[in-house]
């Protein structure tokens, strides 16, 4: 493991441009005047003081979004016109990639290289993908059984509340905002309190792109105040949320108790990554590392339960151990860095607590498991073996750099154990046997099965969960469906030569 994980001086000198709320096309202070600090997780230093929105600010933002939806141009302009603005937005994201990447690094502890070369380009391409759908939203002509002609209209659902997580603000902004814009919706966005800066900058870019005032509104704040106000607001027509299962339940309850607004939830996971005896061991070990330590393990789809068939267990663990020890922890701006700090102090403490639970419950700590460096929320990449299904580290989502290896014997056994979880977000299968692939992929109760790979996410591939990992789909044209309603229009016809 490499040294030098004390953060970068770049954050101290970087000028933060936007710290207020973004409502009706303008950056404004919160009504109360309250603020909060956002922290650089690599240095534990205050980056900026940000306006704190509460219920009254959400009300103001919803009022702007409602006016923009009911009387503004966005839902009424042609799909082609919306497409052109969204493509301009995508271009502006690319033109400001360095700024967006820097904000992701200093505000969220993410790594400069992966964000600059993957997450930001994927974000802009997500806008391009859904821009391409904006002028292709159409209804259908219906074959009625009587002298009636009918057709369907697909109309935007209205004002949407987006509650965005802290583990990938730019990517999640694009994932939620792009399809909603394509559909013709207006929206209020509540970024995570730990990472508001990227979302505020993206709001600025939306104005430059020509998105009309009131269509995109951003209210920084805390979940129990601003987030709760979004979930329970009587004039928000739909809510999307990405985050923990516990908070997702709260969001769903608030939506039901207010105006019965629909919700789309992408929640927690405890995904199985299954390695069979005939697998390419080197490839499987490589993807097990990527599937758990990418973004410091702060991924809902992390394949943190690595099931290894007994015939290759010891060899696989040895390869995994070497790869974990080589996973370089350094300054997030260093392009050679593979591992950065956890996003915030609360998450840092939670991960360390889970590691301690693993040791107390009898799992074997092979490597890692300790804080790293003198400053910042760094935790060594961690590998446990001799893990059993009843241990906390095998049951609960950790959302950190911790791999648990579990041994299995048969296909039937591993399917049963892989499904013995309240979650169902993703999974991985490594084998050369197509029959095993077919059996396992049809048996695993999860929203994705990645065969001989992992993290195969793409804007054209619908992503979402089974069970307590939520419902609804993001990415793919299926995501657009959440933001559209179907209206049937029927009129009688008289003396028609045919029906």
UniProtKB/Swiss-Prot annotation:
**Tissue expr:** Expressed both in apical and sub-apical cells of glandular secretory trichomes. Also present in flower buds and, at low levels, in leaves. Also present in non-glandular trichome cells.
Q: Where does NAD(+) bind?
A: 164-166, 190-193, 223, 243-248, 266, 397-399
Is-annotated flag, keyword Iron? no
Q: Can you state which reaction this protein catalyses?
A: (+)-artemisinic aldehyde + NADP(+) + H2O = (+)-artemisinate + NADPH + 2 H(+); (11R)-dihydroartemisinic aldehyde + NADP(+) + H2O = (11R)-dihydroartemisinate + NADPH + 2 H(+); (11R)-dihydroartemisinic aldehyde + NAD(+) + H2O = (11R)-dihydroartemisinate + NADH + 2 H(+); octanal + NADP(+) + H2O = octanoate + NADPH + 2 H(+)
Among CDD domains, the record links this protein to: ALDH_F1-2_Ald2-like (cd07091)
Pfam families membership: Aldedh (PF00171)
Site residues (Transition state stabilizer), renumbered to this chain: 167
Assigned keywords, A-Z: Cytoplasm, NAD, Oxidoreductase
**Assembly with partners or alone:** Homotetramer.
Briefly, what is this protein's role? Involved in the biosynthesis of the antimalarial endoperoxide artemisinin. Catalyzes the NAD(P)-dependent oxidation of artemisinin precursors, artemisinic and dihydroartemisinic aldehydes, thus producing artemisinic and dihydroartemisinic acids, respectively. Can use both NAD and NADP as proton donors.
Q: Which PANTHER family match?
A: ALDEHYDE DEHYDROGENASE-RELATED
Protein name according to UniProt: Aldehyde dehydrogenase 1
What is the protein's species of origin? Artemisia annua
- Give the lineage: Eukaryota, Viridiplantae, Streptophyta, Embryophyta, Tracheophyta
Query: In the UniProt record, what gene is named as encoding this protein?
Result: ALDH1
């Amino acid at each position: 493991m490499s040294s030098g994980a004390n953060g970068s001086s770049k954050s101290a000198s970087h000028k933060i441009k936007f710290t207020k709320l973004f409502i009706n096309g303008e950056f404004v202070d919160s009504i109360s005047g309250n603020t909060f600090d956002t922290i650089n997780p690599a240095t534990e230093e205050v980056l900026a003081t940000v306006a704190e929105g509460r219920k009254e600010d959400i009300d103001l933002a919803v009022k702007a979004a409602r006016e923009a939806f009911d009387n503004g141009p966005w839902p009424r302009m042609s799909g082609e016109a919306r497409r052109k603005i969204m493509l301009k937005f995508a271009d502006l994201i690319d033109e400001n990639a360095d700024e967006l990447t820097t904000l992701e690094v200093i505000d969220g502890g993410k790594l400069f290289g992966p964000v600059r070369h993957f997450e930001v380009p994927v974000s802009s391409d997500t806008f391009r993908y859904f821009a391409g759908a904006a002028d292709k939203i159409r209804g259908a002509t219906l074959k009625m059984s009587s002298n009636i002609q009918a057709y369907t209209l697909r109309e935007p659902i209205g004002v949407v509340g987006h509650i965005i997580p802290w583990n990938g603000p730019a990517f999640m902004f694009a994932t939620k905002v792009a399809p909603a814009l394509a559909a013709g919706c207006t929206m209020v966005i509540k970024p995570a309190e730990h990472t508001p800066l990227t979302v505020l900058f993206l709001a600025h870019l939306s104005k430059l792109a020509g998105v009309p005032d009131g269509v995109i509104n951003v209210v920084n704040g805390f979940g129990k105040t601003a987030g709760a106000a979004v979930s329970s607001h009587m004039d928000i027509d739909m809510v999307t949320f990405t985050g923990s299962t516990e908070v997702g339940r709260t969001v769903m309850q608030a939506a039901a108790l207010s105006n019965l607004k629909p919700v789309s939830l992408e929640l927690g996971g405890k995904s199985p990554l299954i390695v069979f005896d005939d697998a390419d061991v080197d490839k499987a070990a490589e993807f097990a590392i990527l599937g758990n330590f990418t973004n410091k393990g702060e991924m809902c789809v992390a394949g943190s339960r690595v099931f290894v068939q007994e015939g290759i267990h010891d060899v696989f663990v040895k390869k995994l151990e070497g790869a974990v020890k080589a996973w370089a922890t350094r300054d997030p701006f260093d392009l050679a860095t593979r591992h950065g700090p956890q996003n915030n102090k609360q998450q840092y403490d939670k991960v360390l607590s889970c590691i301690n639970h693993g040791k107390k419950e009898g799992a074997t700590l092979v490597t890692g498991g300790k804080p790293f460096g003198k400053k910042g929320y760094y935790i060594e990449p961690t590998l446990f073996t001799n893990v059993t299904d009843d241990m906390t580290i095998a049951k609960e989502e950790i959302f950190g750099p911790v791999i648990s290896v579990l041994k299995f014997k048969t296909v039937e056994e591993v399917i049963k154990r892989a499904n013995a979880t309240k979650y169902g977000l993703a999974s991985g299968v490594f084998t050369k046997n197509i029959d095993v692939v077919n059996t396992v992929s049809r048996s695993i109760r999860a929203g994705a099965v990645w065969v001989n790979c992992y993290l195969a996410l793409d804007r054209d591939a619908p992503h979402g969960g089974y069970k307590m990992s939520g419902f609804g789909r993001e990415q793919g044209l299926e995501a657009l469906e959440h933001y559209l309603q179907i209206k049937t229009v029927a009129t009688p016809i008289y003396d028609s030569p045919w029906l």
